[in-house]
Amino acid sequence: KANSGELRLDAERIGISGQSSGGHLAMLSAMRPFDSRYSSIPLDADMPDVDACVRCVGMSWPVINPLSRYRYALQERKNEAEWVGDIPECHDLYWVTDKNMIDGNPVCALENGETVQRPPAIWIQGRPDPVHDYLDPESELGIKEPERFAQRYREAGGDIEVLYIKQTERDSRASFDPLAAFFRKYLG
């Protein structure tokens, strides 16, 4: 937004998008645009005074709940699931503690009643996808994470669509076209 003039953009028509961990970060930053932890690098004095609010969020198979995904990966490693790879070690390296995974967690923010921004959102989810579309056994809802987040987001007053596509079509128009239509709808 601060460079919108130079980039010839309308600062009021900014959306954000990401895949997997990037989808998690997109939603987290969209929900907490005024959180000082996410704006600790000051803008140059000659830059316009802007906020980090976005008009909409597009997510593709996000790691929306880092803690449940971490625990799920540890459990599935015991079952020798090939997809697990080094996911737990990467979580340990990035997050360090469970407390951090809770703090940086859009699902926990909603379930804990945190006051957050709720821009319109879309979640594109491939199926079958054991890495992102799974059931957290600790959830009271008994539904997989995409639907859990969507339900909590709606309960908080947000508008979100969850669109399921074939896992084999994630890198195709089946994924890209709905995102493009979503951004056209909200950004004009």
Which ranges hold each PLM region?
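C-terminal catalytic histidine-bearing segment of alpha/beta-hydrolase fold enzymes
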Residues: 122-137, 143-188
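Primarily recognizes the serine-hydrolase "nucleophile elbow" in alpha/beta-hydrolase
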Residues: 1-74
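Short, proline-enriched alpha-helix->beta-strand connector loops that line the catalytic pocket
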Residues: 50-55, 114-122, 156-159
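Serine-hydrolase-like catalytic core of hydrolytic proteins
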Residues: 1-15, 119, 139-145, 152-153
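Stable alpha-helical elements in mature extracytoplasmic
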Residues: 21-25, 50, 106, 145, ...
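Surface-exposed acidic, glycine-flexible loop patches that form ligand/cofactor-binding
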Residues: 5-8, 46-51, 108-117, 187
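Mobile cap/lid helix-loop segments that gate and shape the active-site cleft of serine hydrolases
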Residues: 33, 39-40, 68-113
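Hydrophobic anchor at the start of a short beta-strand
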Residues: 14, 97-99, 121, 160-161
